[in-house]
């Protein structure tokens, strides 16, 4: 299906701290990828670099064959990259529908909604995440599980090709995690390329066919979950076992 994302020797330093250290990998179009590592491993910084909210110290980012390293966030959204955040921050006093409509105003969102209208397109997105019955209420009264769904709906609004999901299972009950797992499966089946940064391994390892492992800013492993969990370096880095 072709490569959609290429990360080449990507490095990000904050003063004397190297948060991402010479990371390289490629993502095929339509892939479903897990990104794991202990706290401080560099997962969120890597997402920030891909999404454009941080600038790399060295290296490059290629999307659909275009070098987007110097592109600002809004231009990357227009190219087809969208993300969620660990801490959900909806526009609290707009309705859930209006939160999604804001994202639909991007060029890709407008193009996708041209035949049906932006409000109908936004409603379709809310329905796809199971929130159509909450369309007219403000997110400040939503339970946390629904806020996580709204976060995904907002990311879908600009009609992305690549979705970066930052800890979508965090803070959820097992039942709520299962709902999000099924939603992610559905989105991947619809053709979205998805990278999930997560520390809840039980759900993630059963969901994705490929896992990237980061530790101290470095990419230390890349492969199927069954292989990853048996690599000594991964066990030591993630579980704190060994010397």
Feature names for model-found ranges:
Residues 2-243:
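Glycine-rich phosphate-binding loops of nucleotide-dependent enzymes
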């Amino acid at each position: 299906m072709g490569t959609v994302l290429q990360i080449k020797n990507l490095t990000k330093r904050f003063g004397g701290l190297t948060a991402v250290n010479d990371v390289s990998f490629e993502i095929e179009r339509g892939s479903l990828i897990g990104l794991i590592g202990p706290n401080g491993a560099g997962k969120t910084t890597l997402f920030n670099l891909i999404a454009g909210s941080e600038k790399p110290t060295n290296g490059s980012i290629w999307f659909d064959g275009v070098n987007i390293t110097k592109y600002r966030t809004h231009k990357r959204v227009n190219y087809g990259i969208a993300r969620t955040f660990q801490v959900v921050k909806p526009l609290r006093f707009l309705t859930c529908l209006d939160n999604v409509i804001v994202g639909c105003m991007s060029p890709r969102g407008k193009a996708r909604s041209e035949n049906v209208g932006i409000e109908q397109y936004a409603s379709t997105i809310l329905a796809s995440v199971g929130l159509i019955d909450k369309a007219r209420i403000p997110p400040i009264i939503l339970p946390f599980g629904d806020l996580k769904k709204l976060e995904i709906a907002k990311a879908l609004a600009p009609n992305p090709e690549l979705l970066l999901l930052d800890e979508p299972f965090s803070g959820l009950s097992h039942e709520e995690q299962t709902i999000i797992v099924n939603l992610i499966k559905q989105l991947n089946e619809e053709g979205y390329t998805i990278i999930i940064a997560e520390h809840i391994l039980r759900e993630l390892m059963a969901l994705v066919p490929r896992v990237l492992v980061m530790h101290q800013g470095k990419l230390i492993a890349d492969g199927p979950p069954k292989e990853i969990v048996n690599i000594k370096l991964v066990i030591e880095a993630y579980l704190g076992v060994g010397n």
